[in-house]
């Protein structure tokens, strides 16, 4: 039994999705509601990570200085060095403490991601590797079935469906076999669809590797032609793949540009760029994701660094992450989830950044601000050239004065 991502998706995410769709029959609203439910559920975990990151940003300069002093002082005594470092972590906290809440919420977020990449929002693919063998080679018929995937056959109705090769994956040249979809109990997928008049799902089959070794029609009738390896892909459409939501034309559409329609041929033979091939709804969501990522960086302080190289990397991170979706496209429904989740986290970061720090850390912040103010203040006319530096040194040495 699967107790991993698939278990969370099938037994947690899909029931929540069906619940909200039952209230308001819109898969777009169901995505929004499911995303918010999950983000509120992991709010305490993500809040712990954000708070720890904020604390570490405050104490990092002091911790680094303390660590360097300890390493220098106990360089010949590893046991004392480790003991002294443990005292520093006990006083200021462990930088790795914020990773644990993040790790706890990852399976939940991955399950949500996997749910939105499958049925009903996107087409579901099944791949089968076949071995075409010579006609005189003996073959033992052993039925083969892929791992089942949840398929929506109607609104709110889904079943685990697997692709099946009744005669097995070793097929003699000249033989014809029927590849089919069915439930784990053996009920044909076509019978399931026939039981729901509103469902018009039409699965299709195609060969994606070894086209010269076999042929197959859309219904799954495969004819073996010559020995070798063949990879067959069966696809079941998502019932909500062509459904729109707000400014999104189709929740299941993948990619910003329709590659085959990027240029059109005019009556005079000239080729012209086809602006209609660009899906502006997906482009807007990708740009929104990048902007929210950048704002989140600014709020959390991750975008600021004294190291110019690190500063450049931080500034480029939102661009790199957003650009990835141009080359590794995702369905529009998944992008909608990512945009909403990122906006939610940005608002969460904004709220948590305004929480008061613990008293000991607040004193450190005030001391750093006071020292920085003295350092950046222009000297008064009656002060000598060294007066400013002397006062800054005094402020660092005696912050309470």
UniProtKB/Swiss-Prot annotation:
The keyword Iron-sulfur does not apply. Residues 375-401 are annotated as: Disordered. It is a multi-pass membrane protein. It is found in: Cell inner membrane. Keywords: Cell inner membrane, Cell membrane, Chaperone, Membrane, Protein transport, Transmembrane, Transmembrane helix, Transport. InterPro entries: YidC/ALB3/OXA1/COX18, YidC/Oxa/ALB_C, YidC_ALB_C. One of its GO terms (molecular function) is membrane insertase activity. It comes from the Bacteria. The chain crosses the membrane at residues 12-32, 96-116, 275-295, 319-339. One of its GO terms (biological process) is protein transport. Residues 389-401 have a biased composition (Low complexity). One of its GO terms (cellular component) is plasma membrane. Interacts with the Sec translocase complex via SecD. Specifically interacts with transmembrane segments of nascent integral membrane proteins during membrane integration. NCBIfam families: PRK02654.1, yidC_oxa1_cterm. Belongs to the OXA1/ALB3/YidC family. Type 1 subfamily. Required for the insertion and/or proper folding and/or complex formation of integral membrane proteins into the membrane. Involved in integration of membrane proteins that insert both dependently and independently of the Sec translocase complex, as well as at least some lipoproteins. Aids folding of multispanning membrane proteins. Probably also aids protein insertion, folding and/or assembly of membrane complexes destined for the thylakoid. This is Membrane protein insertase YidC. The lineage of its organism: Bacteria, Bacillati, Cyanobacteriota, Cyanophyceae, Acaryochloridales. The gene is yidC.
């Amino acid at each position: 039994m699967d107790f991993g991502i698939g278990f969370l998706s099938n037994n947690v995410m899909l029931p929540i999705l069906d619940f909200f769709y039952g209230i308001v029959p819109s898969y777009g609203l169901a995505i929004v509601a499911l995303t918010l439910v999950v983000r509120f559920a992991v709010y305490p975990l993500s809040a712990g990570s954000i708070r720890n990151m904020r604390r570490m940003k405050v104490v990092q300069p002091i911790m680094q200085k303390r660590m360097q002093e300890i390493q220098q002082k106990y360089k010949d005594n590893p046991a004392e060095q480790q003991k002294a470092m443990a005292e520093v972590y006990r006083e200021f906290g462990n930088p790795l403490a914020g990773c644990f809440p993040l790790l706890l919420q990852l399976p939940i977020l991955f399950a949500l991601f996997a749910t939105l990449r499958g049925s009903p929002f996107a087409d579901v693919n099944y791949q089968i590797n076949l071995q075409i063998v010579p006609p005189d080679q003996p073959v033992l018929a052993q039925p083969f079935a892929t791992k089942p995937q949840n398929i929506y056959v109607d609104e709110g109705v889904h079943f685990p469906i697997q692709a099946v090769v009744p005669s097995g994956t070793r097929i003699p040249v000249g033989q014809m076999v029927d590849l089919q979809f069915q439930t784990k109990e053996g009920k044909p997928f076509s019978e399931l669809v026939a039981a729901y008049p509103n469902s018009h799902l039409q699965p299709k089959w195609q060969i994606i590797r070894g086209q010269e070794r076999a042929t197959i029609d859309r219904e799954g009738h495969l004819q073996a032609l010559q020995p070798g390896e063949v990879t067959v892909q069966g696809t079941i459409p998502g019932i909500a793949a062509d459904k729109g939501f707000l400014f999104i034309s189709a929740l299941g559409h993948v990619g910003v540009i329709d590659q085959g329609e990027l240029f059109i041929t005019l009556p005079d033979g000239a080729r012209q760029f086809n602006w209609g091939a660009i899906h502006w709804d997906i482009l807007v969501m990708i740009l929104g994701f990048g902007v929210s990522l950048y704002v989140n960086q600014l709020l959390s302080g991750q975008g600021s660094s004294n190291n110019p190289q690190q500063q450049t990397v931080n500034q480029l991170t939102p661009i790199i992450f957003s650009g990835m979706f141009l080359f590794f496209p995702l369905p529009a429904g998944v992008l909608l989830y990512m945009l909403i989740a990122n906006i939610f986290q940005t608002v969460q970061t904004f709220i948590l950044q305004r929480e008061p720090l613990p008293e000991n850390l607040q004193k450190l912040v005030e001391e750093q601000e006071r020292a920085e103010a003295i350092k950046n203040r222009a000297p008064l006319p009656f002060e000598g050239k060294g007066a400013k530096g002397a006062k800054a040194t005094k402020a660092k040495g005696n912050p309470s004065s």
